[in-house]
A protein has these predicted regions:
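Hydrophobic alpha-helical segments at protein termini of multi-pass membrane proteins
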Residues: 1-193
Length: 193
């Protein structure tokens, strides 16, 4: 395999016997849907921490977190683009759905954590940061778990079912993002009156 430039479909076909083994698939799922989100969500909003002593409002924390999430999504998108560009894959639908949903996820999760941190810094329920962190890990883990389903032999046979799941989940995230953004906006307007 050294120097091989395999498309994701070719790699999946090559690894299918291993992936059909439940312990291996569960191990991959735990890594991708739990460990990676825990690490990414812990480090994604490091930029917001630089604002700790500045007395930012929860709305400002939300915006700073969204910027941190957008920066993270940009770097991740560039790395994923390089991977797709160097493969023989023609799966642009999967790439586009993955990047759109992934970008929304990173921006929303960054905003949630930034909002929670700013609330905590104002002395309002510091434990909320831990709860929001675990919520963002859950949201991220669901996204990654859905994305990894395409490696499951049962889902390989189902065609574009993974993309449908990802698109529906991205739509749910979009609705949650809009609703939460409106909540933050109302809170900010109420605190300035």
């Amino acid at each position: 395999l050294e120097g091989a430039n395999l498309a994701p479909e070719e790699l999946i076909e090559l690894l299918a016997p291993l992936l059909s083994t439940p312990p291996i698939f569960i191990g991959i799922l735990l890594l991708v849907a739990l460990l990676i989100p825990m690490i990414e969500e812990a480090f994604k909003t490091l930029g917001v921490w630089l604002l700790k002593g500045r007395g930012i409002s929860p709305a400002e924390g939300f915006v700073a977190g969204m910027f941190s999430g957008a920066g993270f999504a940009l770097v991740e998108g560039l790395l994923n683009s390089a991977t797709v560009a160097s493969s023989t894959s023609t799966d642009w639908l999967g790439f586009v759905v993955g990047r759109l949903g992934g970008t929304l996820l990173h921006i929303f999760n960054g905003g949630l954590l930034g909002w929670a941190m700013a609330n905590a810094w104002q002395g309002k329920k510091p434990a909320k940061v831990v709860g929001i962190y675990f919520l963002t890990v859950l949201l991220h883990g669901i996204w990654n778990g859905l994305a990894i389903l395409e490696l499951s032999p049962q889902f390989i046979a189902s065609g574009n079912l993974t993309y449908i799941f990802l698109a529906v989940y991205a739509l749910i995230l979009l609705v949650a993002f809009v609703l939460f953004s409106r909540k933050v906006e109302r809170q900010a307007a109420g605190s300035t009156n």
